[in-house]
């Protein structure tokens, strides 16, 4: 229990869009900082550390471990990679026009969003089709759109 401040955190979360964990750390952090004047600073620092862990746990439970991955793929085998993603992983692919600053050649970039559990398969597919492919990967905290959630 966060001592009743969780309701205030939920209200702030609803109207500001901040994560629930961030709202908890803001409200409870103000209380802990105020208490630092009454109690010693060492206890306040321990409380802030515990508060940080609590807020991260709240966000982790709320969002879950199911981060999606965004892959930007630059390959000489664009069509083969595109088809493999569409048919073997059953995910959509977006083809982005790009221009190589070093090579000075136009070359498409394939962008694909996959679930964490599908990422290893995507890596293996790309590596098998084109071992020289350049792949950039990032975590996507949230993915909205038709057909993504399974």
Swiss-Prot record:
Pfam families: DUF2179, YitT_membrane
Gene Ontology CC annotation, any one: plasma membrane
CDD domains: YitT_C
Membrane topology: Multi-pass membrane protein
Cystine bridges: none
InterPro entries with a match to the protein in the record: DUF2179, N-reg_PII/ATP_PRibTrfase_C, UPF0750_membrane, YitT
Subcellular location: Cell membrane
Record bears the keyword Transmembrane helix: yes
PANTHER family: UPF0750 MEMBRANE PROTEIN YITE, UPF0750 MEMBRANE PROTEIN YITT-RELATED
Record-stated family: To B.subtilis YpjC, YqfU and YitT.
Protein name in UniProt: Uncharacterized protein in cccA 5'region
Organism: Bacillus sp. (strain PS3)
């Amino acid at each position: 229990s966060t001592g009743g401040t969780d309701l205030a955190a939920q209200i702030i979360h609803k109207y500001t869009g901040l994560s629930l964990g961030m709202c908890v750390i803001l409200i409870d952090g103000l209380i802990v900082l105020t208490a630092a004047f009454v109690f010693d600073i060492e206890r306040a620092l321990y409380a802030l550390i515990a508060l940080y862990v609590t807020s991260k746990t709240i966000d982790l439970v709320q969002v879950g471990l199911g981060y999606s991955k965004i892959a930007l793929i630059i390959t000489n085998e664009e069509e083969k990679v595109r088809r493999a993603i569409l048919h073997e992983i059953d995910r959509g692919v977006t083809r982005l026009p790009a221009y190589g600053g070093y090579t000075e050649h136009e070359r498409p970039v394939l962008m694909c969003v996959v679930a964490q559990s599908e990422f290893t398969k995507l890596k293996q597919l790309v590596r098998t089709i084109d071992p020289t492919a350049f792949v950039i990967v990032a975590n996507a905290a949230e993915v909205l759109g038709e057909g993504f959630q399974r």
